Amino acid sequence: MPETCPNTVTKMRCAVVTGGNKGIGFEICKQLSSSGIMVVLTCRDVTRGLEAVEKLKNSNHENVVFHQLDVTDPITTMSSLADFIKARFGKLDILVNNAGVAGFSVDADRFKAMISDIGEDSEEVVKIYEKPEAQELMSETYELAEECLKINYYGVKSVTEVLLPLLQLSDSPRIVNVSSSTGSLKYVSNETALEILGDGDALTEERIDMVVNMLLKDFKENLIETNGWPSFGAAYTTSKACLNAYTRVLAKKIPKFQVNCVCPGLVKTEMNYGIGNYTADEGAKHVVRIALFPDDGPSGFFYDCSELSAF
């Protein structure tokens, strides 16, 4: 990994982006770099991460480095990342928690054929996930749900907790959690989960964890529909609803920080099979805008693209 002069770097703001090797994460890295910020691009796969950094450097984004990070591995890669940032940059100014998974598997060939039949550029294609015939091509299991919560919710918590001491050294620390409008409370259909997540004054990490445990228990016992969870995308919806709730808790806990969550929109990425209303570049702009709010900017809010939204 190429060295950077420490004296130069410490004068720059420093950002960590999780899941930065492709899609929205890659574009977030590019845009933060263009804003004069030193970017640590992280992802699980070393080869893909190094290739992403090389691609950015080849397009004149020199202030980007790679460090491996598995958001489900707090002992090894997270600790190593924290040590790297402390030694190299002395502090951390911006954390963008972007890494995430869908929580279900797809019969890819048949799904792509369905997209082709509808028309990739058709206005109708963005509604494909609502179609029962499309949902029949998708499978949700306990194992996939567990992975989804482990990455989308617990992964964010773990990364944030490990990097918090470095963020506290910043004059203007920011945490941006990349969420989804799918995680809005209006889509949380389990009554107990809605009651817990909707009570902002009583929210705690422990209460949010209760919702996660309830969901996983119902997945294991095949009681998802019986107990009123969403019939499709229950793990993803719940993971993002819990992420939004965690954002609120964290913002109250550390008022010196700007802590916000944002839905970048339905973005045309590999995870979405190219379906969306926005390009990855456009989706990333919604995230970067919040990461670069003025020092007196808001905290504890949810943004749907560029608009302030109710949780």
From Swiss-Prot:
Domain of life of the organism encoding this protein: Eukaryota
Activity regulation text: Subject to substrate inhibition at salutaridine concentrations higher than 20 to 30 uM.
Catalysed transformations (reactions): (7S)-salutaridinol + NADP(+) = salutaridine + NADPH + H(+)
Result of changing N152A: 6-fold decrease in catalytic efficiency
InterPro entries according to UniProt: CBR1-like, NAD(P)-bd_dom_sf, SDR_fam
GO molecular function, one term: salutaridine reductase (NADPH) activity
Applied value in biotechnology: Has potential use in industrialized synthesis of the antitussivum codeine and the analgesic morphine.
Thermoactivity: Optimum temperature is 40 degrees Celsius.
Binding-site residues, substrate: S180
EC numbers on record: 1.1.1.248
SUPFAM superfamilies (UniProt xref): NAD(P)-binding Rossmann-fold domains (SSF51735)
Impact when changing F104A: Strong decrease in substrate affinity and catalytic efficiency. Strongly reduced substrate inhibition. Almost 200-fold decrease in substrate affinity and 112-fold decrease in catalytic efficiency but no substrate inhibition
Keywords assigned by UniProt, alphabetized: Alkaloid metabolism, NAD, NADP, Oxidoreductase
Enzyme type, top EC level: oxidoreductase
Gene Ontology annotations of biological process type: alkaloid metabolic process
Outcome following mutation: V106A: Decrease in substrate affinity. Increase in catalytic efficiency
Result for mutant: L266S: 12-fold decrease in substrate affinity and 26-fold decrease in catalytic efficiency
Coiled coil, from the record: none
Consequence recorded when altering K186V: Almost 4-fold decrease in substrate affinity. More than 4-fold decrease in catalytic efficiency
GO cellular component assignments: membrane
Family: Belongs to the short-chain dehydrogenases/reductases (SDR) family.
Annotated protein name in UniProt: Salutaridine reductase
Species whose genome carries this gene: Papaver bracteatum
